[in-house]
Swiss-Prot record:
Residues 1-24, 222 are lumenal. The keyword Zinc-finger applies. Coiled coil: none annotated. Its EC number is 2.3.2.27. It is found in: Endoplasmic reticulum membrane. Signal peptide: none annotated. SUPFAM superfamilies: RING/U-box. This is E3 ubiquitin-protein ligase RNF170. The chain crosses the membrane at residues 25-45, 201-221, 223-243. Pathway: Protein modification; protein ubiquitination. InterPro entries: DUF1232, RNF170, Znf-RING_euk, Znf_RING, Znf_RING/FYVE/PHD, Znf_RING_CS.
Length: 257
């Protein structure tokens, strides 16, 4: 009996751990989880900050004055969206709203005027976060009104020019919340995404689910404990990036139909 006990390997538990009684692995996983959740919350909630970036205030002020001068007569009543939403350019209720790939909303006419103002040779930077705007999502249905048709035409023209630009990994991560929100919204809407794209998303989600429940892992939980879940989160994160890339390609291809 004694010989068997002496032959067994001895693994000290929590020796020299940062917090007594708590494994260092648990502490690392908890800290990384807080960082991941905090980053995700920042990406999702930063859209509520509608303050113009200091470097763009002069340009936005000039565009605002230009829009006010062009409106010699009061504009006719137009449908309003997001009753609690104010366009940061014209400081009025958002009408015919559009959303940029970074998740900020503007009046369609305001963001188009901001693009046309000055001598932009490429894609504009968001007036709020200064992220490069490569996609403009109209958030209204086309109507017979001339303003509506003009804004849709300008948005399509802008997307054709800049939606296919190369994107860095950080840009793709910053675009993730907006693209995923639009992708899943169209996925579950009638007449949204075509079936092949929906099938690809479902297969990707099933593949991620099988990987999460599979005992075969790059970092096995049985050996590394809670740290073994890091590869599962990493695979899921890569999957979300891949879905956003696919959706961007679908939006780009749709422009040339």
């Amino acid at each position: 009996m004694a010989d068997n006990q002496e032959g067994r390997p001895y693994f000290p538990l929590d020796e020299g751990s940062i917090i007594e009684g708590v494994s260092d692995q648990v502490i690392v996983v908890v800290l990384l989880s807080f960082v991941a959740v905090g980053s995700l919350l920042y990406l999702l909630l930063r859209n509520d900050e509608q303050n113009i970036h200091p470097e763009n205030q002069d340009r936005v002020r000039a565009v605002r004055e230009q829009l006010q001068n062009e409106q010699e007569t009061p504009p006719p009543p137009r449908p309003q969206f997001y009753s609690d939403m104010t366009c940061p350019v014209c400081l009025q209720q958002a009408t015919f709203p559009v959303e940029t790939n970074c998740g900020h909303l503007f009046c369609g006419s305001c963001i188009i005027a901001y693009w046309r103002y000055g001598s932009w040779l490429g894609a504009i930077n968001c007036p709020i976060c200064r992220q490069t705007v490569t996609l403009i999502f109209p958030l209204f249905q086309a109507t017979e009104q001339e303003d509506s048709q003009n804004i849709l035409r300008e948005a399509i023209g802008y997307n054709r020019r800049f939606s296919g630009q190369p994107r860095s990994l950080m840009d793709r991560i910053m675009d993730l919340p907006t693209l995923l929100r639009h992708a899943f919204r169209e996925m579950f809407s009638v007449g949204g995404l075509f079936w092949m794209f929906r099938i690809r998303i479902v297969l990707c989600l099933l593949g991620a689910l099988f990987y999460l429940v599979s005992p075969l892992d790059i970092i096995p939980e049985a050996v590394f404990g809670l740290l073994g879940f890091l590869d599962d989160f990493f695979v899921l994160f890569l999957l979300l990036i891949y879905i956003s890339i696919m959706y961007r390609e679908v939006v780009t291809q749709r422009l040339y139909r």
